[in-house]
């Protein structure tokens, strides 16, 4: 009678173990593939551009050219662009040839609504709960507890570049609460 002996040629994994391993690998791969966009959603956009800043984007996601931006705008105009961390940011027109050296984050410090610029009253007015900010974004009427955040605006290769504001807030004389 012939006896079977274990040899190196005989695999030690049975059919059931192989199918379990194959199923586990497939399910794990699909789960990781499905989780990737979910995890990516919670990671803020990387900053790039000149000096660690973010190039301002228009409503279509294109880089904002300073010359085109200033073509149809007057001194004192405030126009929204996509700024640091993807937040809506107002670029302030200084003259027909230049923009101010700061941008104003349009997110209300009360509950996070986007605050529109009211040209008739020369101030920002939050539509959600009535907070009001002056032309520089300083809070003048609550319930918002703080002024709107600032960002530096620079021009590099005809593009508007926003960088974080870390110096003293010129409106209040205090350290910036947002940095």
Swiss-Prot record:
Its EC number is 7.1.1.6. InterPro entries: Cyt_b6_f_Rieske, Rieske_2Fe-2S, Rieske_2Fe-2S_sf, Rieske_Fe-S_prot, Rieske_Fe-S_prot_C. GO terms for biological process: photosynthesis. One of its GO terms (molecular function) is oxidoreductase activity, acting on paired donors, with incorporation or reduction of molecular oxygen. It is an enzyme of class 7 (translocase). Disulfide bonds join 113-128. It is a single-pass membrane protein. Binds 1 [2Fe-2S] cluster per subunit. Keywords: 2Fe-2S, Disulfide bond, Electron transport, Iron, Iron-sulfur, Membrane, Metal-binding, Thylakoid, Translocase, Transmembrane, Transmembrane helix, Transport. It is found in: Cellular thylakoid membrane. Its cofactor is [2Fe-2S] cluster. The chain crosses the membrane at residues 21-43. PROSITE patterns: RIESKE. Residues 61-162 form the Rieske domain. One of its GO terms (cellular component) is plasma membrane-derived thylakoid membrane. The 4 large subunits of the cytochrome b6-f complex are cytochrome b6, subunit IV (17 kDa polypeptide, PetD), cytochrome f and the Rieske protein, while the 4 small subunits are PetG, PetL, PetM and PetN. The complex functions as a dimer. Belongs to the Rieske iron-sulfur protein family. The Rieske iron-sulfur protein is a high potential 2Fe-2S protein. This is Cytochrome b6-f complex iron-sulfur subunit.
């Amino acid at each position: 009678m012939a006896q079977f002996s274990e040899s190196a040629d005989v695999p030690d994994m049975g059919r059931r173990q192989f199918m379990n391993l194959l199923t586990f690998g497939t399910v794990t791969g699909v789960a990781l593939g499905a989780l990737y966009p979910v995890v990516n959603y919670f990671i803020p956009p990387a900053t790039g551009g000149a000096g660690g800043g973010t190039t301002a984007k228009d409503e279509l996601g294109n880089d904002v050219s300073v010359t085109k931006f200033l073509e149809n705008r007057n001194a004192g105009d405030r126009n929204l662009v996509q700024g640091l961390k993807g937040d809506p940011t107002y670029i302030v027109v200084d003259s027909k040839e230049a923009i101010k050296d700061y941008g104003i984050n349009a997110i209300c410090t009360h509950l996070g609504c986007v605050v529109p610029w009211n040209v008739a009253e020369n101030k920002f007015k939050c539509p959600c709960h009535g907070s009001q900010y002056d032309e520089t974004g300083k809070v003048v009427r609550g319930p918002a507890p703080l002024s709107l955040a600032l960002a530096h605006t620079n021009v590099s290769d005809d593009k508007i570049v926003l960088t974080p504001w870390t110096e003293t807030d010129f409106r209040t004389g205090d350290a910036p609460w947002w940095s």
